[in-house]
Each structure stands twice: as C-alpha cells, then as structure tokens.
C-alpha cells in the first residue's frame, strides 16, 4: 500500500458537487501540486478535519474550478491513511479533469473498493463491516438501510465476536487438558462445554434464519402481476409504480412484452413484472407474450393475481387459480368501482389473502400493503440486531454451526474430547473467516471486486 491512490467518489452523473478522494502517504504532496487555498496555506499545513476554499490549477497555472479541500490525517480517516477530498462543481467533465490533474500530480488510479480495502487492511473495519458498506450504498428501502448501517457499525461483528469469546474459553481449556495431561490442569467441565456449544448454535441459527428475510429487503422479490386479459394488470402496474409504465387500453391483449419496474411496498422492494394476459390466442405475437408470462409465473417469488370483479369468472381465471396452488400469492379483486358480477367467495376460498381494490381510483391500495406486510411477515425483521449480508457470510456461519452440531453429537456419542476439540476449532476458524481475521487473499479480492471505484 505504498502508492497513493485517487478516484472520483461521487456518482458518474451531473450533480451539485463532484468529489475526488486521495489516500496514501503522498496524499498531501499530491494535493499541494493541484490545490491553492485562499488563505495561502498548503494542504500539507492544514490540520485534520479542517476544510479550506481554494481552486484547482493546472501545472501551467490555469484555474480549473473552485475547489474545497477537506483533510483527514492518519490514522483518523476512513482508510487509516492520510486522506484529502477535493470537491468541485459536479459536472462530469470538470470532475474528470480534476481527477486527471491529481493523477498527473503523482497519484495512481484506485481500483474497485480500494479505499475500503485499505480500511480493512489497516484495521479500521473488518470484512463483514466492509461488505455492509456496499449494502448502505445499494439500499433501496428503510429496512435494508438499517440492516446495512447496523452491519457497517459492527453490530454483526460484535455478535460473532461474542460467540467466539465463549468458544475460545472452552477451546483454551481443551487445549490445556490435551497439551499438559501430566500437569495439575483442571478437568474439562463437560456441562460448561456443552452449554457454550449450544449457545453458539442458537445464536448462529438465529442469524442464519434471518438471512433470507434480510436478502428480501436488499434484493427485493420477483413479483409477477398475472391475470386474464383486461383484468386491470397494467392499470395496477401504473398505480404501484406511480407512472405510466404500461399501456392501458380497453382492448384485450395490449400488453405483450413483459414490463418491469421496482417499487417499494410494505417496506419491501418488489421487482414487478406486468405480463401479457393469459389466454388461448391465435395471434403469434401475443402467444409469445403469454408463454413469457407463464415462464415468469414458474420462477416468481410472489404473485399478484388480478381478477375483474365486473365480470363472471372465466376459464382463464380458473386455470390461473389452479396454477397458483402452493405459490405465494395475493388475490386482487379489481374494478371495485364497478358493479360486481364475480363469485368473490370462490376466490376467497382459493387464496389465503384477498384484497378488494380499484386500480383506476387507487382505493384499496393501503389494504394491499397491509396484506403484503402480513404475508411477508415484515414485523418479525429486526435489522438493528445484525444480519448476515452475503452468501460468503452465510456459508461461513453455516460451517461454524455445522461444526458445533458435530461437536455436540460427538459428546452425545461419548467420543473423546479430542474429537470435540477439532469441532470447536473448526467453528472458530469459520467465524474468523466471516469477520476476515483468517481469510485468504483470494477471498478478499473477491469481496472488493464487487465494489464501485471510489469507495
């Protein structure tokens, strides 16, 4: 980490401010070659956590833009190194020009996630906290943001360390008993060992149980809006998305391609897919859309099944109800602003949740959100308590849990404590891998290659 790195840390789009971040031993020297403050003080003379207004200049003395320089001195910075942040007006061109001036002054381009990688290598964050940073950046809802913030502040890491602390006490007793059998070493208290193993199992099982729910808030649910033609699927899509995403006409078969949009409903990002009305058709183009709708239904995590209450149930409605048996689905009895002609009781018998709604007026939308909250069990999610964020974390936690269960089974079978020791040590190694205390460089590379440049 000898080289000084730099990158644009704001979004690659026009905005109020553009910012170039510089980190490394030469950060102040690089900034001094680019920045001139109105006070006459060089960046290298500024105290940590101070800012100064000035300008960015080319080597020929040409002024690029007004710039604010913000200084962080090692080790009290995000990366643990000397850091300078140069903020200019947020045009794409001027921000790129500012970065080029910094690179010409001696900095090297930062790779994806290299600032956070340096924070990890310098002990400012562990690997689980680093992964949560990407969760903060990518959060699409309140619960996902809370979970990511808890992770980046170390809540998950503290839970893992608490499990490790209990197991380390037992591991040290086991090691002393195994290494010094002829010394006056107290015998291993097996009940205490078993209690520690079971406590670790319980904590890990809770974390693993929350993984899928946490992923639901982070990644959203693949949600299909299905129904026969003219049931009001596209009108519902437009209502939920808050804009005219789908074409709406009185003619059946208007929607042919799958129209997609992500919306936040009941606190959960729903990746909506408005599909073609499912029916038998001789139109070859519409038929392709119908087949696409059926494929989407097969892989959907949630289905919003739309029925037109102003008409009697038809063949396509019955077929849809049969198709959705055992599938997480909410029945939406649509067009409640019109006289009802449908046998609503039949739908209520077929679906666990039924919502009466008018997609054209919006009446019933709150009820839909309430029913989704119940079916998705959103009240049972407590992100502030710590959540496993990635498949890597999940795999390490599962490995630790499996090892502890094997240790408990070894004790139940009356196997020697040597066998139990191996299981406890395997669990500790898996937990250390989760937080990054014992992890290969290949794993570290894989984690940070998912990051954006500038973070």
Regions found by a protein language model. Give the residues of each.
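C-terminal-of-GTPase-core extension/linker across diverse P-loop GTPases
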Residues: 2-8, 12, 142-264, 281-283, ...
């Amino acid at each position: 980490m000898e080289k000084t790195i730099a990158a644009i840390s704001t979004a690659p789009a026009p905005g109020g401010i553009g910012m170039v971040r510089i980190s490394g031993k030469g950060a102040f020297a690089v900034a001094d070659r680019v920045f001139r403050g109105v006070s006459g003080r060089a960046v290298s003379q500024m105290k940590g956590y101070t800012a100064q207004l000035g300008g960015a200049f080319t080597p020929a003395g040409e002024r690029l833009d007004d710039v604010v320089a913000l200084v962080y001195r090692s080790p009290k910075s995000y990366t643990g190194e000397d850091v300078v942040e140069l903020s200019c007006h947020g045009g794409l061109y001027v921000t790129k020009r500012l970065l080029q001036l910094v690179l010409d002054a001696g900095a090297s381009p930062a790779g994806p996630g290299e600032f956070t990688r340096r924070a990890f290598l310098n002990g400012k964050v562990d690997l689980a906290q680093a992964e949560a940073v990407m969760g903060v950046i990518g959060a699409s809802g309140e619960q996902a943001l809370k979970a990511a913030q808890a992770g980046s502040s170390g809540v998950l890491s503290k839970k893992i360390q608490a499990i490790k602390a209990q197991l380390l006490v037992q591991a040290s007793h086991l090691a002393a008993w195994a290494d010094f059998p002829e010394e006056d070493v107290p015998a291993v208290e097996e009940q205490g060992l078993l209690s520690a193993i079971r406590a670790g199992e319980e904590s890990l099982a809770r974390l693993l149980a929350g993984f899928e729910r946490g992923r639901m808030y982070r990644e959203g649910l693949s949600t299909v809006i299905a129904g026969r033609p003219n049931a009001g699927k596209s009108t519902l899509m437009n209502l939920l998305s808050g804009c005219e995403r789908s074409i709406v006409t009185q003619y059946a078969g208007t929607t042919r391609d799958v129209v997609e949009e992500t919306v936040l409903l009941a606190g959960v990002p729903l990746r909506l897919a408005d599909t073609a009305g499912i029916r038998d058709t001789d139109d070859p183009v519409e038929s392709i859309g119908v087949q696409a709708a059926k494929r989407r239904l097969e892989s959907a995590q949630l289905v919003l099944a739309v029925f037109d209450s102003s008409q009697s149930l038809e063949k396509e409605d019955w077929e849809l109800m049969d198709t959705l048996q055992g599938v997480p689905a909410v029945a939406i009895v649509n067009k409640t602003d019109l006289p009802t002609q449908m046998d609503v009781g039949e739908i209520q018998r077929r679906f666990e949740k039924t919502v009466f709604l008018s997609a054209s007026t919006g009446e019933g939308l709150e009820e839909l959100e309430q029913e989704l909250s119940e079916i998705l069990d959103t009240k049972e999610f407590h992100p502030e308590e710590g959540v496993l964020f990635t498949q890597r974390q999940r795999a390490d936690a599962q490995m630790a849990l499996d090892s502890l269960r094997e240790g408990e089974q070894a004790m139940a079978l009356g196997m020697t404590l040597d066998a139990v020791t191996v299981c406890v040590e395997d669990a500790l190694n898996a937990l250390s891998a989760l937080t990054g205390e014992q992890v290969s460089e290949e794993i570290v590379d894989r984690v940070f290659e998912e990051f954006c440049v500038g973070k």
